[in-house]
């Protein structure tokens, strides 16, 4: 009996990863061949501003002084015609606050908020309170959005009322080290493959915290982001789905982000992801 049990466990341990790998590859290819090719062009760029849903792009910032002057000009050149930028300085110890104040004075689309250091979830909740948009987008302070990314994500939610959120397609910016180049392959192939495969189920499991768009009324319905969870993106994804909404993947909404280039930084990031997933399951 014990021998048969051990054999069954051995078969499962071998077959499960192989079976799941076959499924992810097959499903993602089906999505790419039969669905992704039918996606249209940007919709809202030629429309009058008053006919386009407003988007509040929230950017929580903690010690992003080295990145903001590079990232903000890209955000100001987005082709989507109706948006505001809300930068939330989460108690930064560098010159982040001074930078966002300077940009807010230079462009009326920018709102600068300041708070004591309370974490990303608290910063996003702060931004949600003042957001004027029908939709709220969340990106990281070091992220560079593709000029059409917001257009594609709004288009996805406008055409699909059952969805409460849509997540974009993160790509790695820093490729100067071997570790950085390895993560390019991970994000471009493995993570994209899994998101495409999950899309065939009708919903994906989690949004990407570096680039995502939510219906504002859905976020208010679920009470915003949980401030006691280490990975707010995993937690908010499950809150949205338990409230009865699905989540979409929009592969055309590209967003370039900085990733760890040292092993210790990568270890801390992946440990945080694992801890956040465990916290959400236990919750």
Regions found by a protein language model. Give the residues of each.
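Cell-envelope/extracellular polymer assembly enzymes that use nucleotide-activated donors
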Residues: 53-56, 84, 220, 235
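Conserved donor nucleotide-binding strand/loop of the catalytic core
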Residues: 83-86, 97-130, 168-169, 197
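Short, acidic, metal-binding catalytic loop of nucleotide-sugar glycosyltransferases
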Residues: 73-82
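Long helical/loop segments within the catalytic core of UDP-sugar-dependent glycosyltransferases
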Residues: 116, 121-123, 147-230, 267, ...
């Amino acid at each position: 009996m014990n021998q048969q049990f051990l054999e069954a466990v051995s078969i499962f341990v071998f077959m499960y990863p192989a079976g799941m790998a076959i499924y992810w590859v097959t499903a993602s290819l089906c999505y790419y061949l039969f669905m992704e090719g039918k996606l249209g062009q940007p919709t809202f760029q030629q429309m009058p501003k008053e006919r386009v849903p407003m988007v509040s792009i929230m950017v929580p910032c903690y010690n992003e002084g080295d990145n903001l002057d590079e990232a903000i000009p890209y955000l100001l050149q987005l082709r989507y015609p109706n948006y505001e930028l809300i930068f939330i300085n989460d108690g930064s110890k560098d010159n982040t606050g001074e930078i966002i104040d300077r940009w807010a004075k230079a462009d009326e689309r920018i709102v600068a908020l300041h708070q004591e250091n309370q974490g990303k979830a608290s910063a996003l909740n702060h931004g949600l309170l003042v957001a004027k948009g029908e939709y709220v987008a969340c990106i990281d302070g070091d992220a560079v959005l593709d000029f059409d990314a917001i257009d594609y994500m709004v288009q996805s939610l406008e055409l699909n009322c059952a969805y409460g959120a849509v997540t974009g397609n993160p790509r790695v910016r820093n490729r100067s080290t071997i570790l950085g180049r390895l993560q390019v392959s991970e994000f471009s192939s493995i993570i994209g493959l899994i998101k495409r495969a999950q899309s065939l189920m009708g919903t994906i499991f989690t949004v990407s915290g570096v680039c995502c768009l939510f219906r504002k009324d859905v976020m208010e319905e679920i009470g915003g982001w949980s401030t006691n969870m280490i990975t707010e993106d995993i937690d908010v994804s499950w809150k949205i789905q338990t409230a009865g909404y699905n989540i979409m993947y929009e592969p055309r909404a590209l967003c370039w982000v900085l990733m760890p280039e040292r092993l210790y930084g990568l270890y801390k990031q992946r440990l945080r992801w694992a801890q956040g997933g465990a916290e959400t399951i236990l919750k």
